[in-house]
Amino acid sequence: MDVNNVELIISAVRPEQYPETDLPEYALAGRSNVGKSSFINTMIRRKSMARISQKPGKTQTLNFYKIEEALFFVDVPGYGFAKVSKTEREKWGVMIETYITSREQLRGVIQIVDLRHKPTEDDRMMYEFLKYYDIPVIVVATKADKIPRSKWQKNAKIVRETLDFDPDDKFVLFSSETKMGKDEAWQFIKEGME
């Protein structure tokens, strides 16, 4: 998709704050500091539309980005961030679960994992949750440029096995540096919009 117009419409915490729209939505889920903001910026060809932070846990709301009057990316808080209180993490969990299970406009979830590391229990639980609710999902393994190409397949196998990955789902190696995987991710989105 050729992206020229992107706008952050609202940062929401409750359903009544979600934008009233019929446009399809794609949620981006992943651990804190896994590269969600870099993924968004790469997909929409912007350097800093989604703020990138060295501090995990920066996103604390559901951020609705309208793209080309055609769809929304919804950046959800990173899960598994230890430096916020348990109460705060539980609030984020409820906010994410409410959005994912009740939003009619949601067409799919882009689950982002770090190719360099074995997925955590939180990653596994998120994937299992999406499968349980029969929500279309693509797993995007970011930061491929940070490890030697010779390790890509080995690391991808570890990610798939740890998640108990469904071979019917799409799995993409991604790099915000080289733009590898960008076209495959857009293909998943386009298919869900048809």
Curated annotation (Swiss-Prot):
<feature type="binding site">
    <location>
        <begin position="30"/>
        <end position="37"/>
    </location>
    <ligand>
        <name>GTP</name>
    </ligand>
</feature>
<feature type="binding site">
    <location>
        <begin position="142"/>
        <end position="145"/>
    </location>
    <ligand>
        <name>GTP</name>
    </ligand>
</feature>
<dbReference type="GO" id="GO:0000917">
    <property type="term" value="P:division septum assembly"/>
</dbReference>
<dbReference type="InterPro" id="IPR027417">
    <property type="entry name" value="P-loop_NTPase"/>
</dbReference>
<dbReference type="InterPro" id="IPR006073">
    <property type="entry name" value="GTP-bd"/>
</dbReference>
<keyword id="KW-0131">Cell cycle</keyword>
<keyword id="KW-0460">Magnesium</keyword>
<feature type="binding site">
    <location>
        <begin position="75"/>
        <end position="78"/>
    </location>
    <ligand>
        <name>GTP</name>
    </ligand>
</feature>
<dbReference type="GO" id="GO:0046872">
    <property type="term" value="F:metal ion binding"/>
</dbReference>
<feature type="binding site">
    <location>
        <position position="59"/>
    </location>
    <ligand>
        <name>Mg(2+)</name>
    </ligand>
</feature>
<keyword id="KW-0132">Cell division</keyword>
<dbReference type="InterPro" id="IPR030393">
    <property type="entry name" value="G_ENGB_dom"/>
</dbReference>
<dbReference type="GO" id="GO:0005525">
    <property type="term" value="F:GTP binding"/>
</dbReference>
<comment type="similarity">
    <text>Belongs to the TRAFAC class TrmE-Era-EngA-EngB-Septin-like GTPase superfamily. EngB GTPase family.</text>
</comment>
<feature type="binding site">
    <location>
        <position position="37"/>
    </location>
    <ligand>
        <name>Mg(2+)</name>
    </ligand>
</feature>
<feature type="binding site">
    <location>
        <begin position="174"/>
        <end position="176"/>
    </location>
    <ligand>
        <name>GTP</name>
    </ligand>
</feature>
<dbReference type="Pfam" id="PF01926">
    <property type="entry name" value="MMR_HSR1"/>
</dbReference>
<dbReference type="InterPro" id="IPR019987">
    <property type="entry name" value="GTP-bd_ribosome_bio_YsxC"/>
</dbReference>
<keyword id="KW-0717">Septation</keyword>
<keyword id="KW-0479">Metal-binding</keyword>
<dbReference type="GO" id="GO:0005829">
    <property type="term" value="C:cytosol"/>
</dbReference>
<feature type="domain" description="EngB-type G">
    <location>
        <begin position="22"/>
        <end position="194"/>
    </location>
</feature>
<protein>
    <recommendedName>
        <fullName>Probable GTP-binding protein EngB</fullName>
    </recommendedName>
</protein>
<feature type="binding site">
    <location>
        <begin position="57"/>
        <end position="61"/>
    </location>
    <ligand>
        <name>GTP</name>
    </ligand>
</feature>
<comment type="function">
    <text>Necessary for normal cell division and for the maintenance of normal septation.</text>
</comment>
<keyword id="KW-0342">GTP-binding</keyword>
<keyword id="KW-0547">Nucleotide-binding</keyword>
